[in-house]
Design a protein with these regions (language model features):
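Conserved strand-loop elements at the edges of beta-sheets that form or border functional pockets
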Residues: 17, 25, 43-45, 61
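Short, conserved beta-strand element in jelly-roll/cupin
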Residues: 6-8, 18-33, 72-74
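A short glycine-rich, His/Asp/Glu-containing loop-to-beta-strand
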Residues: 1-15
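Short beta-strand His + acidic residue motifs that chelate non-heme Fe in jelly-roll/DSBH
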Residues: 14-15, 33-34, 51, 56-62
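Short acidic-glycine-tyrosine-enriched beta hairpin
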Residues: 37-54
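Conserved hydrophobic/aromatic beta-strand scaffold that supports enzyme active sites
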Residues: 2-6, 23, 48-50
């Protein structure tokens, strides 16, 4: 599945995971990516992030800039994504 996303400045998705590999390609802007238990990373145009199956993570735009990206998610019999909980303001602002 290929998906095009635009996160407006300050927005982010929920903690979630995918049953199969997902590749995120940053087309423009600046954002954040974090895997559970790891540091929050700043991502920018040209960055490529691969999320292995079943690894909990979140991503979104920085407070100042939109984030535009494409994701390519491998097929899995049990769905595209499993939504978990909201990313707290504290987690987002770390």
């Amino acid at each position: 599945m290929i998906t095009h996303f635009r996160f407006t400045a300050g927005s982010r998705n929920f903690w979630h995971y995918h049953p199969a590999d997902q590749t995120l390609l940053v087309l423009d802007g600046e954002g954040f990516y974090q895997e559970e238990g790891g540091p929050k990373r700043t991502i920018r145009k040209g960055d490529v992030i691969v999320s292995p199956p079943n690894v909990k993570h979140w991503n979104g735009a920085t407070p100042e800039q939109d984030l535009i990206c494409i994701t390519v998610t491998e097929s899995a019999l049990d769905g595209h994504a499993v939504q978990l909980r909201a990313v707290t303001d504290e987690e987002y602002g770390q």
